[in-house]
A protein has these predicted regions:
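Active-site neighborhood of HAD-like aspartate-dependent phosphohydrolases
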Residues: 1-43, 60
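Asp-based, Mg2+/Mn2+-dependent phosphohydrolase catalytic module
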Residues: 1-3, 110-111, 115-221
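Conserved SAM-binding loop
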Residues: 14, 103-106, 164-165
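Hydrophobic packing residues within well-ordered alpha-helices of enzyme cores
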Residues: 25, 54, 91, 98, ...
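Helix-loop "lid/cap" segments that line or gate small-molecule binding pockets
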Residues: 26-29, 49-64, 117, 151-152, ...
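Metal-dependent phosphoesterase signature
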Residues: 35, 55-93
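Residue-level detector of anion-binding/catalytic polar loops
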Residues: 35, 102-104, 181, 205
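Short, acidic loop-to-helix structural element flanking the phosphoryl-transfer center
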Residues: 79-105, 111-115
Length: 221
């Protein structure tokens, strides 16, 4: 299918930020008496929004979770992301090759954080106002399909005509539930060999290790 528009996840698809999130999450949970490695944080929590992450932590640890866990994570996140994050390799070139298609971002992160990092990378102009946050624009963030349905409606394009680029099983589940076509991208520094299999298990038919490979698959000049 030749898509009518492309929707990008942000963390791990545009910004190489997931490894930083996993590091701070593992460190903060371990300091709170909930031993969590970076690898476990990547596997358990990548792709979730803030509320969903806290729910997953509660499901994992139960009554051992400190009552101020949300505040601890918020404070550590502010520190860890005080500096901008780098771009995923190849995203600028891919955006330059898809200017004929409408694009949007559908993320679990805040629009302020997304815009600040788009400005830092120098690609904000590719998305205009089409930046959508699961914590700001819809009631339920990923893995629910709401944010992708919202982005599709804002673009005026049926979900079945969209191509979504995702790096996490959680995000892929959301996009597929919305009725979109989904490809996996494993170009981030957080991506491990098992990620391709995890994306496939969610129903993602094609997974690409680079934006160059994805561009070739789409037949982009």
């Amino acid at each position: 299918m030749t898509p009518d528009a492309i929707i990008f996840d942000f963390d791990g698809v545009i910004a190489d930020s997931e490894i930083r999130s996993a590091e701070l999450l593992g460190r903060t949970l371990t300091a709170a008496g909930l031993p969590t490695s970076e690898e476990e944080a990547l596997e358990r929590y990548t792709g979730y929004g803030r509320v969903e992450t806290l729910a997953a932590i509660a499901a994992r640890w139960g009554a051992r979770v400190p009552t101020d866990m949300a505040e601890r994570l918020a404070a550590e996140t502010t520190i860890a992301f005080a500096q901008p994050v780098p771009a995923i390799t190849g995203v600028e070139a891919f955006l330059a090759r898809t200017t004929h298609l409408p694009r949007a971002i559908a993320s679990s992160s805040s629009t302020g954080y997304i815009r600040a990092n788009l400005d830092h990378i120098g690609i904000a102009g590719h998305f205009g106002d089409h930046i959508y946050s699961g914590r700001e624009h819809v009631a339920r963030s990923k893995p629910f399909p709401d944010i992708y349905l919202h982005a599709a409606a804002a673009l005026g394009i049926a979900p079945a005509r969209l191509l979504v680029i995702e790096d996490s099983p959680v995000g892929a589940r959301a996009a597929l539930a919305a009725g979109a076509s989904v490809v996996g991208l494993t170009a981030g520094s957080h991506c491990r060999p098992a990620l391709s299999d995890a994306l496939a298990a969610e129903g993602v038919g094609r997974v690409f290790a680079s934006y160059a490979a994805l561009a070739d698959h789409l037949g982009l000049a």
